[in-house]
Amino acid sequence: MAEFWASPYGFALSMLLQGLAVIAFVMGSLIFMVYGDRKIWAAVQMRRGPNVVGPWGLLQTFADALKYIVKEIVIPAGADKFVYFLAPFLSMMLALFAFVVIPFDEGWVMANINVGILFIFAASSLEVYGVIMGGWASNSKYPFLASLRSAAQMISYEVSLGLIIIGIIISTGSMNLTAIVEAHGGDYGLLNWYWLPHLPMVVLFFVSALAECNRPPFDLVEAESELVAGFMTEYSSTPYLLFMAGEYIAMYLMCALLSLLFFGGWLSPVPFIADGWWWMVIKMWFWFYMFAMVKAIVPRYRYDQLMRIGWKVFLPLSLGWVVLVAILARYEILGGFWARFAVGG
């Protein structure tokens, strides 16, 4: 048996099983993310939320997914059918593909590569193409204009996200996500984590993640309270479901990055409790709860306000933070407190 797993066939089978496990975990989480999102929103508005299908409404997401799947796929006249169907599939698969390098525990990662951060950015940057393709292939000017606005929004906030992560890379001296989590280790639990020295960037990263995922209050392209759905206006049935799934998976990816970069990943917040994958899941769900609460309580921004805050506030702040962290690391200024965080751990 050991010889089989060491052979190319065994390696291929191992990668296949790991890939299926990642897909099962993310898609299983997706079902309860949609349910939790609706329940939290309902609680803030003093409603019950989903409560009909299954106990406590737990099967409501399955019923909604089935409803989308059995509906007719209406293709607009003159649409590019190949690109029309490729766009939602591409959006979902790229978001799912990024989880290949996400470690849930020590050794619990499908591909423990040294450029994990770059891999995630490459995958997330390509998601813009799915949005553009979906708007263009619909053969309608309104979805196409919405896709351009959405692409501009996503690209704008990717710049800030990248600069924020550069600060973490300087502090840890690595782009390997497992190494970044290991750099959080220490005798003081959560006080050793990078949220403390990089606290302003935690706030900027969270808000930028909202804009990157088209989540409220930055859901200007496909606001749920409006009559149209932005670049997805001409989509229905399963393709529309794939677009929705891609957005939730991308949001879950941002929750994972927040947990790994700033909050110790699978490390325990207190030294006397064992580390484990459950801490990673708890932290991801905490950040998802924060995403849902923002959706429920924060009013929507105008598009000009969204772009202004991205380019005139977040970009200068994140760039200035990179310069500050680089200076502290290079000259070992403020040794003691910053020596632990700004000189490669």
Curated annotation (Swiss-Prot):
Superkingdom classification of source: Bacteria
The keyword Electron transport is assigned to this record: no
Gene Ontology biological process terms in this record: aerobic respiration
GO molecular function terms noted in the UniProt entry: NADH dehydrogenase activity; oxidoreductase activity, acting on NAD(P)H, quinone or similar compound as acceptor; quinone binding
PANTHER family: NADH DEHYDROGENASE SUBUNIT 1, NADH-UBIQUINONE OXIDOREDUCTASE CHAIN 1
Protein family membership: Belongs to the complex I subunit 1 family.
Protein name: NADH-quinone oxidoreductase subunit 8
